[in-house]
UniProtKB/Swiss-Prot annotation:
It comes from Oncorhynchus mykiss (Rainbow trout). Testis. The protamine CIII/PPC 6B sequence is shown. Protamines substitute for histones in the chromatin of sperm during the haploid phase of spermatogenesis. They compact sperm DNA into a highly condensed, stable and inactive complex. Coiled coil: none annotated. Changing V11P: In 18% of the CIII. Keywords: Chromosome, Developmental protein, Differentiation, DNA condensation, DNA-binding, Nucleosome core, Nucleus, Spermatogenesis. This is Protamine CIII. GO terms for cellular component: nucleosome; nucleus. It comes from the Eukaryota. Residues 1-31 are annotated as: Disordered.
Length: 31
């Protein structure tokens, strides 16, 4: 079994662009 490489530096999480699904689907505005 190939060994998994351990990341030496902390992995940065990829930020997803903010998508407001709630507004699109429900059409309800959040206060």
């Amino acid at each position: 079994m190939p060994r998994r490489r351990r990341a030496s530096r902390p992995v940065r999480r990829r930020r997803r662009p903010r998508v407001s699904r709630r507004r699109r689907r429900g059409g309800r505005r959040r206060r």
